[in-house]
């Protein structure tokens, strides 16, 4: 098959075949299959630069002849020597003067002895200079000085290296707060159901609570009144009970917040001035004296009658709103003033008060715990508000 001239091979890409332009052999153009200058098979895949441009030269020679350029062979031409220099000076020229350090490295000018000693107080940098257990009078290694100075300069000029310990501690706090908040949220969501169970248990003292909305004709199985399905007639009553419970919880939170703000002195309510009216038609009260220090709350309230002098009463720094409510209730209900001596006497008997409290806790403790246990998740929230507000 190697001498079969009937097999066309236009560009010579098949191994062991060359293109015969006349499709016959003669003395000037021998059979190309017998050409001793042809390439072997591994060389046929080589990409050359020649007659057809980069990578387009046929591997066995182009159609333009057997010249080196046609076959993609490059001839190295020696470069012409440079012309003789006309400069009379020969040899190495002197090195030019370097620009000042303050122009090339301005950050290095900030590194003076004061900054060096301040940085030396850092425990991390101090460990590079003095060995463990050594003193400041020890020998300082030059290599450590160089590294410390360069690292300190780079720390001033380059980007700071992030401290993974600070990043981890910074992320740990929000994650713990998120976990605690989610835990409290799940517990708070159980408060309405627990209070609903306690509410319905009051109707079944000593027995198992059973929904009263089901009857013999309904297809609803026996269930608790706190878990009524939507098709049960008692479902609407369960929703009403839980809505009332939510309102009570919201009211409890608002009362606690009001008490906390009043205790902190953030409710500067003007007390009732003796002899003044409690209605809106009474004398106009205006706070004229600012509070002591930098507080924005006033310290006293004044009223000025049309035919008299100005009367000012100081505002309590704490429990101002509570005292205002007590004064208002004492004006409306005169019998409350009779309880003041009794309360003062009872508070003055501290041993008796403590014994009474201990006895009440011992006697009513278990039942009070069953009643107050649903409100336990609210205690951490109240505690955080009390501490941080």
Curated annotation (Swiss-Prot):
Residues 2-163 are annotated as: Pre-S. Residues 109-163 are annotated as: Pre-S2. Belongs to the orthohepadnavirus major surface antigen family. Systematic vaccination of individuals at risk of exposure to the virus has been the main method of controlling the morbidity and mortality associated with hepatitis B. The first hepatitis B vaccine was manufactured by the purification and inactivation of HBsAg obtained from the plasma of chronic hepatitis B virus carriers. The vaccine is now produced by recombinant DNA techniques and expression of the S isoform in yeast cells. The pre-S region do not seem to induce strong enough antigenic response. GO terms for cellular component: membrane; viral envelope; virion membrane. Residues 2-242, 192-242, 359-364 are intravirion. Keywords: Acetylation, Caveolin-mediated endocytosis of virus by host, Fusion of virus membrane with host endosomal membrane, Fusion of virus membrane with host membrane, Glycoprotein, Host-virus interaction, Lipoprotein, Membrane, Myristate, Transmembrane, Transmembrane helix, Viral attachment to host cell, Viral envelope protein, Viral penetration into host cytoplasm, Virion, Virus endocytosis by host, Virus entry into host cell. InterPro entries: HBV_HBSAG. Glycans are attached at residue 309. The large envelope protein exists in two topological conformations, one which is termed 'external' or Le-HBsAg and the other 'internal' or Li-HBsAg. In its external conformation the protein attaches the virus to cell receptors and thereby initiating infection. This interaction determines the species specificity and liver tropism. This attachment induces virion internalization predominantly through caveolin-mediated endocytosis. The large envelope protein also assures fusion between virion membrane and endosomal membrane. The middle envelope protein plays an important role in the budding of the virion. It is involved in the induction of budding in a nucleocapsid independent way. In this process the majority of envelope proteins bud to form subviral lipoprotein particles of 22 nm of diameter that do not contain a nucleocapsid. Residues 74-103 are annotated as: Disordered. One of its GO terms (biological process) is caveolin-mediated endocytosis of virus by host cell. Residues 85-95 have a biased composition (Polar residues). Its main location: virion. The chain crosses the membrane at residues 171-191, 243-263, 338-358, 365-387. The large envelope protein is synthesized with the pre-S region at the cytosolic side of the endoplasmic reticulum and, hence will be within the virion after budding. Therefore the pre-S region is not N-glycosylated. Later a post-translational translocation of N-terminal pre-S and TM1 domains occur in about 50% of proteins at the virion surface. These molecules change their topology by an unknown mechanism, resulting in exposure of pre-S region at virion surface. Interacts (via its myristoylated pre-S1 region) with the host SLC10A1/NTCP; this interaction is essential for viral entry. This is Large envelope protein.
